[in-house]
């Protein structure tokens, strides 16, 4: 039986040079009979896991690749599929299969940004790299990334966030770990609270986006809300090397338009049915039975319906609001495909974060969840308190106390694993991303209970003021709080000091292994899983802040771990890199509290002091942007 390094070496080549495959495929008579149901989506077409037919074919291919009993049979079948199915569809379905097959445990996927660099790097930059490689084929090539806009567009101030390679890769990877059409019966593996996680992960991205807007002197975003409104323009500056066509730009002033597969009124109807559901406090399943939207399962049920996923209780009635919204926005310039143009970046999980409309659309989706949350009772002091524990003080340790500096840091991306430049030498691009200085938390806690307490430490960060400089009221601020960390801590009687480094955050991914590292045999730990590689990029943990220093509030809360842990005790999570966003391997989601607790429900208070219990703390911190590293 092949070892993990041997399997890694066999799988890597299947991801290389996918942008250079030809459209010609072998005759169907020569295909493995198990591939009979795939190959419908033409090669050279942009694959979208939001599109119902694309996702259906990808699910068929995944099941074909998941079924072989031996690794060798799986690998041979994947090699055959690679040359007959759509390039993007293959990368998606093959990735889902690799990270879920038991015999691929320990195998690490190469970074999607190296597999399809054309989804992450502006076409002007790739064009420059091609010229340099042609002119100097005997040397390694390094080019600088080209700008995609200018100050005439206010949104360009946020290009560093929207176009961040790690953030876009995270979004692609999350949808690979949590496929919309996941079949728990077929695989025997359940994705616990998948619908609620869909809601929470995207809510957090919207909160982070608004924090970045405030950091750049912009107002908070205006949610999408009207299916007939004229939308802002956007130009992605990306060209698909699979099709040779640009990702569609969107001129300002266009509205959503009917597609050949679906009309705008269908999506409006789905929205209305979902809104009716939470007002009535129940949804209708396929047999027309009422399913109650209770506090424990309501968000999970709604998440499956809104996305929609295979867990939807009634997809035929509630439709697929989120997914078709992505498709409609991506095809606004060519809704009926009469011009045979590529869709826009909203069609692809690895590119959609680049478009400002992504955040407005997801804030619209999040508002539906918030309407449901408003039907639940607000948390009381008894719900929030942890008797016997009192937070004495909280401090952020960096070069200056309670002040963290951010900056732009240069990084490099290898293009030549995904693109054929006609040279054996390496071709790289240099780009900048936001980063921050190392920092840690010191939390002093008094345990007056006389016994050992197991606590869940929850750390959030939110802006203190709005765009006008007014202090945010708690009900506004709660939707802007971003989760920084959540971890278990044992607290003895008396005074305890908790020290926690920011690099230990459970929302960020520790390391992304490159093609070269994987080829050299650098592997993740043996107990690593797909969940270890899923997570928000570490360098984007905190917002940019301002040159003068922007005021934020650090919220720390202690809750009872013996109640929070679904195992009921101090159980170990096998893979704990980014459990808040990505869950845990073969276990229940490792926190019984609602995701985002205690900020998931509206509150009627006007000041934080009205609800702060002894086990909570609010500390003013400053984030200062200092430019390039």
Swiss-Prot record:
Keywords: Copper, Disulfide bond, Glycoprotein, Metal-binding, Oxygen transport, Secreted, Transport
Subcellular location: Secreted, Extracellular space
Disulfide-linked positions: 534-582
InterPro entries noted in UniProt: Di-copper_centre_dom_sf, Hemocyanin/hexamerin, Hemocyanin/hexamerin_mid_dom, Hemocyanin_C, Hemocyanin_C_sf, Hemocyanin_N, Hemocyanin_N_sf, Ig_E-set
Keyword Transport: yes
Binding of Cu cation 2, residues: 322, 326, 362
Sugar-bearing residue positions: 447, 506, 615
PROSITE patterns recorded: HEMOCYANIN_1, HEMOCYANIN_2, TYROSINASE_2
GO CC annotation: extracellular region
GO molecular function terms noted in the UniProt entry: chloride ion binding; copper ion binding; oxidoreductase activity; oxygen carrier activity
Entry keyword annotation includes Membrane: no
Binding site for Cu cation 1: 171, 175, 202
Tissue: Hemolymph.
PANTHER family assigned to the protein according to its UniProt record, in alphabetical order: FAT-BODY PROTEIN 1-RELATED, LARVAL STORAGE PROTEIN/PHENOLOXIDASE
Further comment found in the protein's record: The two copper ions bound each have 3 nitrogen ligands (presumably contributed by His residues) and share a bridging ligand (possibly contributed by a Tyr residue) in addition to binding oxygen.
Similarity comment: family membership: Belongs to the tyrosinase family. Hemocyanin subfamily.
Quaternary structure and interacting proteins, as annotated: Tarantula hemocyanin is a 24-chain polymer with seven different chains identified.
Function (record text): Hemocyanins are copper-containing oxygen carriers occurring freely dissolved in the hemolymph of many mollusks and arthropods.
Protein name: Hemocyanin G chain
Organism of origin: Aphonopelma sp. (American tarantula)
Organism placement in taxonomy: Eukaryota, Metazoa, Ecdysozoa, Arthropoda, Chelicerata
